[in-house]
């Protein structure tokens, strides 16, 4: 199963693709989507188009995205939510099932503690995906989100099916 992880951001959105075969994980690709300028609509469209390119090139089977946390900067949180919304819309248009994970859960899964530093996440992603060179902290976070989904995604899908039944 191929999993696309997304770390949403308006200025820089990280993405990472991993392959899961049984309990084995391997790195496929990772990168950053950038949006600059003053026009919010154009920036969101740019992110959408870049995510579409990633999906078309790497053909993931499932996706995972980090949940938004609310902080003291309301305007910043709103912009993050808009970028996350565009990412979710793009994934839905591609027909991908999406898992959503809290930042602390991702860090606890990959590092072992929920309040890990960026450097710890990067280090553990490299250990769990040999040969992987993340193209930045946001790409490493996206790979960590994909790893988290590899561990919890199947169980989450199963529990959602059980709730519906």
Swiss-Prot record:
Cofactor binding, note field: Binds 2 Mg(2+) ion per subunit.
UniProt-annotated catalytic positions: 7, 66, 138
Binding site for Mg(2+) 2: 66
Residues at which Mg(2+) 1 binds: 7, 138
Cited function: The RuvA-RuvB-RuvC complex processes Holliday junction (HJ) DNA during genetic recombination and DNA repair. Endonuclease that resolves HJ intermediates. Cleaves cruciform DNA by making single-stranded nicks across the HJ at symmetrical positions within the homologous arms, yielding a 5'-phosphate and a 3'-hydroxyl group; requires a central core of homology in the junction. The consensus cleavage sequence is 5'-(A/T)TT(C/G)-3'. Cleavage occurs on the 3'-side of the TT dinucleotide at the point of strand exchange.
NCBIfam families named among the record's database cross-references: ruvC (TIGR00228)
Protein name from the UniProt record: Crossover junction endodeoxyribonuclease RuvC
Organism for this UniProt entry: Ruegeria pomeroyi (strain ATCC 700808 / DSM 15171 / DSS-3)
UniProt lineage: Bacteria, Pseudomonadati, Pseudomonadota, Alphaproteobacteria, Rhodobacterales
Name of the gene this protein is made from: ruvC
